[in-house]
Amino acid sequence: MKLKHLTIFLFIFIYRFLFVKSDCYLINNERPETKITKIRCDDQVISILLNPNNRTDATLEKDTDGKFYFDVVNFPYKDRLCDYTYDIYFLPEIPSLPSVPTIGGSVNFTYNYPCTSVYGRIKPLNIANKIVTPYNINLDQFTMRIQPGCGDLIINSGSRVIYNASYQTGDIPNKPTIDDQGNITIQGSNLYNTQIKINSNDPVENLNPTGNLDSTHSTIVFSLPESQYQGNWTIDVTICDVFYKSYLYTFLPIITVMEGVLNDNGGNLTFTGDHLSVNPSTTISGHFGGKPISCFAGTSKSVICSIPSRSEYGGSGYDVPLNVTIGKYTTNTIKISYDLPLIQGVSQRGTSQIFNVSGVYFSGVISMTIITGANIKTNILKKPTPTLEEPGFFIESNNTIFIFLPNNTQPGFMNLIVGDGGSKSFTSPRYNFKITPTITAGQSFKSNTIGGDLIISGIFMRTVDSDGRDVPLTVKSEPGGPICDPLKDGDGLSFTCVLKSGFGSSHTMNVYYNLLPVGSFVVSYNPPYLASSDQEKDGTIQINGNNLGESVSNSIITVVYLDGSRANGTVVESSHNLLTFQYPAGNKNTASYLFQLGDQISNMAGPFTLKPVIENNNPAVPCGGGMVTINGHYFFNYTKDTTTITIGKVPCNISSINVTTIECVILPNLKSLSPYYTSGSKPLIISSSNSATEKVYQSSITGYSNYTFAPPTITNTSDIDQTALITIYGTSFGDANLEILIDGKPCTQPEINIHTYSSLTCNVTNYDEMLKYNYSNTKFNISISVDGQYFIAQIFQFKYESTISYSENKSSGFPNEMYIGIVAIIIFLALIFFAIKTQVEKYIEERRARKAFRSVDNLRLKLREKHAAEIAKHYSFGYESAPKPNKSYFYDLGKKLSRLPLIRCCFKEHTD
């Protein structure tokens, strides 16, 4: 033994002094597993080994004791520093590690003092008693693979712990699920070493099932026989031997469906579901339609019950409730039916009359009945090959029937009547379904703008709800579009829609049944058509035609002239057959017409040539000559130089002319003309020497072009103002030799409204006398004569109203009775005085008036003779010359007598 130890000692001694030249030493003779922070060296420069197996020199600094020291802890490359010698051993360090999941895996980290002095070998680590050797991924980082685990993560180097951490903690965010196969699934993260413990109020075989963890440690599944769970459960979950959470579950028995068919005779039927396991000591029973029935245990997913016959049950046999009680738990309730036909759904095949009826036990159906509101029944028979012409039904399968309904079927209920074993009949419950009217696609209609009845085709057009009340169809178009009011119909194949007046080339009319769209059709109004045209005296033009509509705001009339230019007229009024518009301003009287109503344009009518139209049928013709204004339209190409106007045969000289107005002047002294030309109604004739003008249009305006040289008339007067001015109103106040007499005295300086000859003003010559004598409320005669008394107005009387007011002077000193008496005497005497004075003045004024009229008559006779002679020099009419004054003594005497006031007032009109 001693020899062996001696041999080892000699080997170490020889190796150390022959092969290892150590110039550094431990300061405190630290043990190999002691952390070395500093070593002392003899030389200032030493050789050190760095990973990966690279030796380099390090320069040391001298300490205060004069020695050189190598500071291991603060060495900048300690993550690459190897042991100095085999006996100067640096304990490895791991400053930090990233979080490690329970699945483990490769981890990158910093590894200080990673290698030994022998060829720079990497120092191994120990994790959970397993050797792990890190390896470089670069000079600064190492990688090691950590095995799956949970809880503490302790890393050792030899027997020394160099890093103490933990795996990531497990987490279960959602409640574990349990499926019908007995699988308990837990999902989360870091579920390594997850276990459950089941606590139940019912006995179970295994309270600690084993789970199957997936590779990602995110799902673990525990499997149990389904029969093991029923009732209330508490599942305790532990992760890595640490309690995590408890979850509560309740497992009640459930039945979902009946297997097989329940016929009239009843029998044992199997009902499938979940959690239906029965222990030997557990009782089981059931209820069918509220009556107890016997049930037997099957499997955990089935139970068997005895169902009575339909006659024993005594009910309708449809939707009978059934449930099962297992021990202290009762299942849910399901409804089952005997094998009787039952409609479960009805659907229309597209928009046809064919309906698909789905349900159960249809094989025995022999007839069907449609029941509508008011209990109207329609029987539909079973046919091998029903058609739309011969409605009926056929059975496709035990669950499907095809029905061909009549066109006039109304919405309502459907009933099935079936055979039952050949001895009984059974009526199934009513199934309510709606038959919706359907409009035949692609229908379009044309209509005049006045509208009319439209017959809309379709099916099921007899509209009535389930209570027998009418449900009208409604028809709507776009906003502002036409209106169509549906009427009730009876055959089911169509309905009538009354289209209101409208216009437009295309309108989509949508049909609604109970506010639901059932189809549409298109309405197109016929385009407008223009035929003939007429002119009106007011200048408007009327066009006859068809489909002209009633919408002025949507109407456009276009006038197309011969040169192709266009202008729009103004539509005044429009009806379906007649259009009235105003011709556009301009100087072109020949044009064609186009009419646009909405988006439709008419034919081009014409060309038409406008004729001049006289509008006023009684223009003011001055009786003694003067201005005549002729209002009308379309005096195109009429000029002063080429146009002549005569009234009867009296010429009217044109002073101005435009498209709508002609003004002309009749020379005065009509008295010099023969009464043949100036009495009665005379035609107005407008002629032109210009070939481009049209003859005045008079054929349709009877009497509108006749004029009368009427004598003046007085209709009213104004009061005489303080300047002695009076206004006289009337007609035909001519301006030739005009004379006005008021109470026999002339009214001077007359001014006439020459545009209408209906008013004049003049100054009253005896106004001062009226004021002086206060002729208040006294009637005065007014007479007017024109053109040397050839035209004399009927005498008009007016009351003179004084503009002077009097005020009563009041005095004192007399008793009231005396004052009243004196006033009464004065008034009486004044009345007598004024009565005498009035009679005397009246006599004097009458003599003065007669004398004045005689003087005026002599003057008038001289003027008339002079006017007649002057006119005769300038005018001649046919073979007749201007009339000459009668020179006989009796003629002059008769004329003079006729001028006397007493004689003149007896005649309504003066003629020669």
Swiss-Prot record:
Give the way it sits in the membrane. Answer: Single-pass type I membrane protein
Q: Name one GO cellular component term.
A: plasma membrane
Question: Does the keyword Glycoprotein feature in the UniProt annotation?
Answer: yes
Question: Does the keyword field hold DNA repair?
Answer: no
- In this chain the IPT/TIG domain maps to 532-609, 612-686, 715-796
TM region(s), chain numbering: 816-836
The alphabetical list of record keywords is: Cell membrane, Glycoprotein, Membrane, Repeat, Signal, Transmembrane, Transmembrane helix
Q: Where does it primarily localize?
A: membrane
Q: Where in the cell is it found?
A: Cell membrane
Disulfide links within the chain: none
The lineage's top-level taxon is Eukaryota
- Which PANTHER family has this protein been placed in? IPT/TIG DOMAIN-CONTAINING PROTEIN-RELATED-RELATED, IPT_TIG DOMAIN-CONTAINING PROTEIN-RELATED
Report what the protein is called.
Tiger protein E1
Give the organism, scientific name: Dictyostelium discoideum (Social amoeba)
